[in-house]
Amino acid sequence: MPVLVMSVLAALPPLPPLPPLPAEPFTLPPYFDYGATFLWALSGALLGARRGYAIPGILAVAFVSSVGGGVLRDGLFLQNGPPVVLRSGGYLLLIALATLLILIAGARIQRQRHLPQILALVDAVGLGAYAVVGMNLALAAGLSLPAVVLVGVVNAVGGGILRDVLMRREPSMFLPGTLEESLALLGCLLFVALVKGLAINQLLGAWITIAVITVLRLLAIRFGISSKPLHGFREYCERQEP
């Protein structure tokens, strides 16, 4: 039977490759890109400081929190030379500055009343924005549509995954509660549907995707919308909690 199945599969004609989407340029405004990098580095440095890490540890957490997704995108998937964050000194300078601020005035910064709201807003906008940037670069590299979606999701949430692994925590995307990864995937699928399915201009589709994901993320934060464990395993999950 296995031989027969393999013979039938071998006789089938190869599937045609998926046509790539038009790779029109889409880039984030530099002030947003640098601003988001700085704030995410600040957030990562705060986490490292709260864990009691030494200066190298705080700097490492700040680095992966802010640009880890881009490093994974360029180094693992696109492989088109050194990652962008290493070709421009501005990113590393901002990460170092954020770490220095935490070392000097970390206790005062974390007491700022509006810091969580600012970080939540940047996170909401950046979730869709960096997903779109990752997909655009994947399109320019000629990747298939499933690969384009994968690169977009990794670019959006890869930094958080690396941060959790580095800090020996379960990645948040594996746990119920957060919707970041689900919304990033939804945004990538929405972008592909708009541009490929509805033939919308790629730049317009990018901004629509960013707007939709930003609104959904802010609504989830505002109303406490979260994911849940699978129904049949909820009791088991509760028993395993420390």
Where are these regions (language model features)?
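Short, strongly hydrophobic alpha-helical membrane anchors
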Residues: 1-28
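Structural signature of hydrophobic alpha-helical transmembrane segments
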Residues: 24-37, 83-97, 144-157
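The first (N-terminal) embedded transmembrane alpha-helix
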Residues: 30-43, 61-64, 187
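C-terminal ends of transmembrane helices
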Residues: 42-51, 74, 101-116, 161-172, ...
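Cytoplasmic-side transmembrane-helix entry/capping segments in multi-pass membrane proteins
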Residues: 56-64, 88-93, 114-126, 151, ...
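Short, structured motif recognition centered on aromatic/hydrophobic residues
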Residues: 60-64, 71-77, 150, 154, ...
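Small-residue-rich segments of transmembrane alpha-helices in multi-pass membrane proteins
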Residues: 62-70, 120-136, 179-192, 237-242
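Loop-to-transmembrane alpha-helix initiation sites
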Residues: 88-92, 144-149, 176-185, 199-210
